[in-house]
A protein has these predicted regions:
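Short, glycine/serine-rich, charged loops/turns that create anion-binding
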Residues: 30, 151, 247
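Conserved small/polar residues in nucleotide/adenosyl-binding loops
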Residues: 238-246
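FMN-binding flavodoxin-like domain, especially the glycine-rich phosphate-binding loop
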Residues: 134-236
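Extended, subdomain-level signal for the structured scaffold at the beginning of enzyme domains
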Residues: 4-134
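A residue-level signal for beta-strand positions that form part of recognition/binding surfaces
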Residues: 20, 185, 243
Length: 247
């Protein structure tokens, strides 16, 4: 994926340098374990990103259905603004869980996973599937990040014979998808993923956005190359051997 570097472009706003970046979290067929893992990140921590505590990096404004202090229409308003191009700041989309085929649920007048409502043709307000949010927000997102095994590869909800026809973010967006920066979906696998892997990836994207660093390198599976070049077992051996060397 390093070959896509030539198509990169930094997002600039008429108002001047980037001071904030919005992060829209969407939850599909998930257990919220990836959210818990993200909150446990330490280097950098979610708190550091939200408070712009890392020198040079813009403030991250997180919109999360579980962690947000707002609710209802007030919470969902920013999602609608991003969809309509009225946000006034760049944004990234983080998707947790596999993406269900909502056309199946629609046949029975329901949905698999939804957040917020919108007015339908008959004047009633109907739930908005998170798959639709992903479809609507992905085109103008600076990056789309698939968080966890379900989002990256499909996970348990996508097992053979499942009734939801669930799939990964990559499969849902299609092989030709590129973000507004020219990036294909970024994959942070793991059940649950290491929280630091997610926050460090976000920080690297922010550094590139503001011109403080190069385009992060991703491997052939869309994973941050510097984080996933070693296997979990090899990393475990490294951690186990360190105390022995210190003694």
């Amino acid at each position: 994926m390093q070959s896509i570097a030539t198509s990169m472009k930094r997002i600039t706003l008429d108002e001047g340098p980037i001071s904030e970046v919005h992060a829209f979290w969407l939850a599909g067929m998930s257990c919220d374990g990836c959210s818990i893992a993200a909150v446990g990140a330490k280097n950098p921590s979610v708190d550091q990103l939200l408070k712009a505590a890392i020198p040079g990096l813009p403030k991250v404004i997180l919109h999360h259905p579980v962690l947000s202090v707002t609710a209802g229409d007030e919470f969902i308003e920013s999602y609608h603004k991003a969809k309509q191009g009225k946000l006034g700041a760049p944004y990234v989309v983080l998707y947790e869980g596999s993406v269900a085929d909502e056309s199946i649920a629609e046949k029975f007048g329901g949905y698999w996973s939804a957040m917020g409502t919108e007015e339908s043709n008959d004047g009633t307000h109907q739930p908005i599937p998170t798959a639709k949010w992903l479809n609507d927000l992905a085109p103008e997102a600076a990056a789309v990040v698939a968080v966890g095994t379900c989002a990256t590869w499909g996970g348990i909800p996508a097992a053979a014979g499942n009734v939801t026809n669930s799939m990964s973010v990559m499969d849902f967006l299609g092989k030709d998808y590129l973000s507004s920066l020219g990036l294909p979906p970024i994959n942070i696998p793991g059940c649950a993923p290491v929280g630091d892997n997610l926050t460090e990836t976000i920080a690297s994207i922010l550094m590139f956005l503001v011109g403080l660093g190069p385009l992060p390198e991703f491997d052939g599976l869309g994973r941050p190359a510097w984080l996933y070049k070693d296997t979990v077992h090899r990393l475990s051996l490294i951690h186990i051997s360190e105390p022995t060397r210190l003694r």
